[in-house]
């Protein structure tokens, strides 16, 4: 087995297979779940809008894939909803069966210097999740732009109780980058807390993913590359990785 094949298998196991499109419907969510080829590899989670959590759960159960987590998003994508709405969204999503909540911080408030607002959104969302759901915190690194703000947002997410810190919504001009990833991982490492990392948006090929795996190993060590601490948020990546794995089986 080549190194590329091993990496491809690892990438699938770390993936949040994602569909967050405005025209999503039950059929598209079923198609998303049906794109999983159990023989080639099973992702860690699927990520869908809250109203499709139940559809995703049923589709996974029909494929005997109930162990795959279902994630959803809150305060998405602009980070501008009032806190009470965000908490309501969170509780409804958990009632629908969401295992993981990907919260967008009010990053525009952070750019204005309102760190306390960000901390409140994270800590209150964490309380709403309780022990029922993991909290992944999206800092929208491509909009924060500066290393100082990216590090600060990561610190606030950790302080608020995030289980993972995630780069991006995938809905802005600049999404996951290796530069932002390096800052975020070093900030997580410095905290000495067991916080995971998720790269989302722009990771489209096995080659793209491999660059993130290499950087993460250098900073956090091999053991960090497990679904409990590392994820890729992606849609088209699965097809590319399956292609690599399919060719390896020929």
Where are the regions that the model predicts?
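Alpha/beta enzyme core
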Residues: 2-41, 51-197, 206-235, 243-250
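Terminal helix/beta-alpha structural elements that buttress the NAD(P)+-binding lobe
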Residues: 200
């Amino acid at each position: 087995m080549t190194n590329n094949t091993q990496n491809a298998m690892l990438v699938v196991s770390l993936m949040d297979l994602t569909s967050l499109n405005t025209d999503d419907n039950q059929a598209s969510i079923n198609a998303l779940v049906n794109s999983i080829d159990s023989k080639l590899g099973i992702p860690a989670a699927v990520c869908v809008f809250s109203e499709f959590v139940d559809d995703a759960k049923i589709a996974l159960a029909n494929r005997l894939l109930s162990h795959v987590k279902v994630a959803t998003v809150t305060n998405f994508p602009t980070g501008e909803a009032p806190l009470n709405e965000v908490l309501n969204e969170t509780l409804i999503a958990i009632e629908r069966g969401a295992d993981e909540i990907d919260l967008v911080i009010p990053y525009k408030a952070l750019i204005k210097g309102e760190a306390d607002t960000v901390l409140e959104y994270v800590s209150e969302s964490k309380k709403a999740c309780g022990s029922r759901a993991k909290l992944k915190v999206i800092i929208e690194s491509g909009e924060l732009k500066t290393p100082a703000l990216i590090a600060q947002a990561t610190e606030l997410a950790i302080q608020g109780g995030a289980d993972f810190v995630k780069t991006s919504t995938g809905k802005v001009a600049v999404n996951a980058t290796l530069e932002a990833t390096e800052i975020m991982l070093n900030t997580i490492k410095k905290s000495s807390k067991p916080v995971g990392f998720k790269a989302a948006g722009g990771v489209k090929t096995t080659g793209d993913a491999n660059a993130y795996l290499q950087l993460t190993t250098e900073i956090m060590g091999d053991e960090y590359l497990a679904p409990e601490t590392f994820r890729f948020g992606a849609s088209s990546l699965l097809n590319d990785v399956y292609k690599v794995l399919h060719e390896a089986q020929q």
